[in-house]
Curated annotation (Swiss-Prot):
Gene3D superfamilies per record: Ankyrin repeat-containing domain (1.25.40.20)
Keyword Cell cycle: no
InterPro entries: Ankyrin-KH/SAM_domain (IPR051631), Ankyrin_rpt (IPR002110), Ankyrin_rpt-contain_sf (IPR036770)
SUPFAM superfamilies: Ankyrin repeat
UniProt name for this protein: Putative ankyrin repeat protein RF_0922
Signal peptide from the UniProt entry: none
Organism: Rickettsia felis (strain ATCC VR-1525 / URRWXCal2) (Rickettsia azadi)
Start-end of each ANK repeat: 5-34, 40-72, 75-104, 110-139, 145-174
């Protein structure tokens, strides 16, 4: 059952942070309901990542279809970009192997990638997982705030990440000056 706002009981429960309700709902919901996209372009998984609900993300990921795992919200986010933004390292680790190249390289409406967000949050292990999977264009991405993954990694003193990024970046991106 879907409300006139396009929500299921699960998306409402996730949105309200009702973890125990989600734990009961998830095993009892159909595949269609678990993968449902609401009127705001969010799935239960993207909402859970946005809310920082690690336990709910862990329950949802194995139940989600590949299409839902790779879903892009109306704001250009994926579950991966939202998990990186919230610093959910373990969720990023679960998502990366399940995601398509296109979804891993997704640029949000704010000009961020999962890599820039992981660097901003200081998630060194996630950066290490992402760099080999990202396109040159995504690695060189400049956010709407004027940062690259390299400037963000340098700011967080992530020396190993800087060393991994530099050989994969264009000279222009390496010489980019953050705003």
């Amino acid at each position: 059952m879907v409300t006139n706002k396009g929500c299921t009981a699960l998306t409402w429960a996730v949105d309200k942070g009702l973890e125990k309700v989600c734990e009961i709902l998830i095993p009892n919901m159909s595949e269609q309901a678990i993968n449902h996209v609401n009127n705001n372009g969010s799935t239960a998984l993207t909402l859970a990542a946005w809310k920082g609900l690690e336990k709910i993300c862990r329950l949802l990921i194995p139940k989600m279809s590949p299409q839902a795992i790779n879903h892009v919200t109306n704001n250009g986010n994926t579950a991966l970009t939202l998990a990186a933004w919230k610093g959910l390292e373990k969720i990023c680790e679960l998502l990366i192997p399940k995601m398509s190249s296109q979804a891993i390289n997704q640029v949000t409406n704010n000009g961020d990638t999962a890599l820039t967000l992981a660097a901003w949050k200081g998630l060194e292990k996630i950066c290490e997982m992402l760099i080999p999977k990202m396109s040159e264009q995504a690695i060189n991405q400049v956010t709407n705030n004027g940062n690259t993954a390299l400037t963000l990694a340098a700011d967080k003193s992530l020396e190993k990440i800087c060393e991994m990024l530099i050989p994969k970046m264009s000279k222009q991106a390496i010489n980019h000056m953050a705003l």
